[in-house]
Amino acid sequence: MFIKFYFFIIFLILNFKNNYASPTLLDSVLSSTSSLSSPGSFFIETEFCPPPLLYRYSSDLEGDKGRGYKYVEFPNGTMSHCVHPCPSLYFSDGDWTTMMDMSLIVATISFFASIFLILTYSPLMNPSYNNRHTIGILSMSFGIFLIMFTDMYNLKKRFTLGCPSETRYAIQNDADCLITGLIFQFGCVSAVFFWTALSLDLYFQITNRNISRKYDLYYFIGVNLISLIFTFVPVISKSYGYGDFALGCWILDFNYALGCFWIPLSVCLIFSTVVVLMILYEVYKIYKASNQKTSLKGHIKPLLCLISNCFEFFYVFGYSLYLATKLTELHDNMDAYIKCLFLNSQNDPDSYTCPDHRLKLGPQFLFFLSLRLLGVSGIVFYGTNSKVRKIWKNSILINNRFIGKYFSFNSGTSTPVGSKNRSKTSSQLYDNSFGDSGILEEIREYDEKVKNGIIVTPGGDDDNINNNNNNNNNNNNNNNNNNNNNNNNNNNNNNNNNNNNNNNNNNNNNSNENNENNTQEIELTNINTIDNV
C-alpha cells in the first residue's frame, strides 16, 4: 500500500512539472507587463542560458550594451543575463570559418596584386607617371591595397579583432577596430571614385578628347578630400564597430553608412554604367567600319575586366540593400529562435521546433568574395599588357648589371628590321598617357593602317607584329631596289638585269666614292694652299 502511494506522488510531481512548470517560468515573463516605467529593467533571474547563448551578469545594463555586449531582449522589453555570442548566430561556426578562410586567401592574392600595380605605375618604375590616367590607376590600386590590408591584419587575429571576447563585439573605442574601420572605409570610397574617373578617362581617350593637364591635380586632390570626409564623418557619432554580418569593423549606423558610402556608390555605379555603354558603342562603331569580325578579339579582355568590376560593385550594393530591407524580419526570426531555446531548456529537448534563423552561406560568401576580387581584376586589366612588360624591362629593378649578368630578356641576338620605328611609335603612344590597357594603342594603330590602306587584326602577339614589320620592311627594301633598277634600266624586270643593275649601282657608288675622295683631296690641297699664303 505504501509503495503504491509513493509511485502516485511521483507521478503527480512529474505531471505537474511537464504541464505547468515551464510555461509558468517563461510564458509568464514573456506575457507579463512590467510595472516599471523603463523597458528592459525586468530580468529573468537565472544563471542558466541555453546554448549557444552565454551567461554574463550585468549590474549596468545600458553601460554594458554600449561596450559591445548584446543581451537577449524579448519583444516586451524583458531582459536576461544571457548574451549573444560573437560572431553572430546568423551563421554557423563552420560557415564563419569558411568565409574567413576564403577572405584571407583571396585578400592575400589581391594584396600583392595591388602592390605590383602600385610599383608598376609609381615614379620608381614608370617614367611617364605624371598623367591623369596613370595617376588614376595608381590611386585606385592604393585604395584596393588599403582594403586588403585590413584583411592581412586579420591573418593572426582572425575573429579576435571583431570579437575581443566570445561575449563582446568590438566598438569604436577599441583601437584596432577603429583603425581598420577607417582604413577600410577610405580604401573603399577612394577605389570606387577613382574607378569611376578611370572609366570616364577611358572614354575621353577613345574619342580623342583632350582635357587640360591642369585639371589632373584638382581631380586628384578633390577625390581624396571627399573620401576623407566620408571616412571621418561617422566617427562623430561613434558609428564604427563590428556587426552581425561582417568579417571586420565598419560603419554600424545605417544612416551614416547610407550617406557616406551607399549613396555615393550608387551614384558612381549609375554614372560608370552609362560611360561603359558609351565606350562599347564607340568601339562598336570602329569595328563596324572595319568589316572584320575577328578584330573584336583584341578588345574583349579589357572591356570584360572593366565590366566585371562594375558587376562586383553592383552585387555588393544589391546584397547590402537586400539585408537592409530584410533586417526587421531577420531580427524577428532571431527572437523567435531564442524564445524556442528557452522553451526547450525548460522541457524535454526538442519539444519545440525552432524556426530557421540563419542566412544562406552562398550569397554572403559571394559578397565577401566580390570585395576581395578587386585586386585580381585590377591586375588582369592593368597589369597584363605589353606596356607593363616594357615598364618592368626598362626599370631599375630589372635593367641593371646584376640581373643582366644572369638573365637576358632579349628574344634574339639580332635586332628586327624596323625595330627603331616600332619603339618610337610605342613610346609616342605611351607618352599620350593611355597605354595602360592597350585598347587605345590598338585603335590608333588600326586607324593609321586603315588610312594607309592596310587592314590587319589589332591586338596580335608581339611575334606576329615583328614578323609583319620584317615582311613590310623587306617588301619596302625590295620595292626600293626594284625602283632603282627600273630607273636605271628603263623598267626592265628580269632578275639578271636586276643583278646587273645592282652591280652597276655598286660600281657607280664606288665611282662616286672615288670622286668624293678626289674632291676631298682637292679641298685639302686648296686649304693647304690658303694656309701657305
Swiss-Prot record:
Q: Which residues lie on this side of the membrane: Cytoplasmic?
A: 125-134, 199-216, 281-302, 382-533
Question: At the top level of its lineage, which domain of life is listed?
Answer: Eukaryota
- Show the ranges annotated as biased composition (Polar residues): 519-533
Instruction: Provide the species name.
Output: Dictyostelium discoideum (Social amoeba)
- Protein name (database record): Frizzled/smoothened-like sans CRD protein H
Which segments does the topology annotation call Extracellular? Answer: 22-103, 156-177, 238-259, 324-360
- Where would you find this protein in the cell? Membrane
Cite the InterPro entries for this sequence.
GPCR_Fz/Smo-like
Q: Does the keyword Translocase apply?
A: no
Q: Which GO terms describe its cellular component?
A: membrane
Query: Which residues are in coiled coils?
Result: 501-528
Disordered, as annotated region: 454-533
- Composition bias of kind Low complexity appears in 466-518
Keyword set, alphabetical order? Coiled coil, Glycoprotein, Membrane, Receptor, Signal, Transmembrane, Transmembrane helix
